[in-house]
Amino acid sequence: PESAAIYVFLGSMQEILSDYIDLFGRPKLPPAYAFGVWISANRWNCEEDVEEQLACLKKHRFPASVLVLEAWSDEAAFYIWNGAQYEAKPGRARCEDYDFTASKYWQDPKGMIDKLHEEGIRLVLWQIPVWKKQGEEEEPSSQLALDAEYAVQNRLCVMKQDGTPYEIPEGNWFAGSLIPDFTKEETRRFWFEKRQYLLEMGVDGFKTDGGEFIYQEDILFGDGTTGREGKNQYCQDYLNAYTDFIGEEHVLFSRAGYAGAHRTPIHWAGDHQSTNEEFGSILTAGLSAAMSGMSFWSFDIGGFAGALPDPDLYLRSTQMACFSPIMQWHSEPEGGQFKELMPGITGNNERSPWNMAAVYGKPELLDELRYWHNLRM
């Protein structure tokens, strides 16, 4: 491409990394709590689930420093707690805008966050950079409709060169959705004024999923970049915007990235199957990331998708995670993330240490796993 810039690095591995960091900037050091044990499962979608996990940690004497919630929001605007009652309005979102008394999911999210903090556990919430196109089976979100209308009217979403809004093409994740143009200061202001109240409630970070949403070349970003030029840069603009928003004592947990991703940690190798083959690939990917300047990477202990890992794979994966930059276990939705292609198990498919021991009838597995969790802490 005529607009391409090619950099050639020579010397030892140490010299190459040093020159790369000089060019793109030094890595950002995550806060200390990020180096403990992260716990996560897609099925956790209410305060009762969080209470259950706190009880399990105490019962089985396992440490944790971060709890991740994926299914926490309305699954529409992605900044409103599921079940909250409110009136759609323009402008900044505030905690007092939402009534949680009738929610069957989150009756007191602020109190829950405070309790987690009292237990020494930080909270990370899932995010996705879209103004979602809702399905016919979904309850329409008045707030999402208001936000998307404002984004289009003020050209805060990514636009095509013909002046129409870009929509994620059919056949892709979140097809038909609009995506924010993070090259624009006004977009960043509008996007994050909706989420500032979450930090004020005590939320400690965001699991910034997705970002690989540029599938066409006939796009024109606010900074003049075309879709061809910005295809890879978009996900990094997304992470740069969130990094600037959260400040120093908060964390990101991201999947996509581009040149400069080492300055917006942490990244994880997401959605791999619970097989020995993919476990080997995780080691290769982690070493490759580290040699590319990405110091803080992670993966899902024992895998994320498909049938549960066997006890041997889960134990070896836990051992590797103990000595990896970030230690985290996570689980796909019940029935499988990719159930049309690769069904998961029915019922509780959680990759927690206690569920693994219960499923396989091996209570002694807990003692082995506890050793590596405590060694990490």
Which residues fall in each region the model found?
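Catalytic-domain carbohydrate-binding cleft regions of carbohydrate-active enzymes
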Residues: 1-377
